[in-house]
Amino acid sequence: VLERLKSIYLLWYGFYQTLPKAHRHSLGQRIDNLLVESIEAIAIASFLSRQEKQPYVRVAIRKVDTLKIMLMILWETKSLDNKKYIALSGPIDEIGRMLGGWNGQLTKVLEQTRDKQNSPAKAEEK
């Protein structure tokens, strides 16, 4: 996930330089920040234990969802042409699916851990 997001950022950086000035310093800057914050959240999550990862994965999901909307606005205002929008939105959608899968796996593992801790066998041991 991190490697793909990094390649999206490098692609975005080239497009960012060519945005109209009116959007470069508003929407463009916000999109840039969202990408950096997503990379940061995923990097942090990758170094944490399973129990600690989920909040950071969820932050990354929110950032990526917001990023999709901001890119759509740039495209709808004709500040980003079709080719550039497609080049960015496809991989970003894929990142969103990957993060959703990661979040689902973490949820399942955390639920299994919680169920084991609350199982009747554990209660009998006490």
Task: List each model region and its residues.
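Amphipathic alpha-helical assembly/interaction segments
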Residues: 1-126
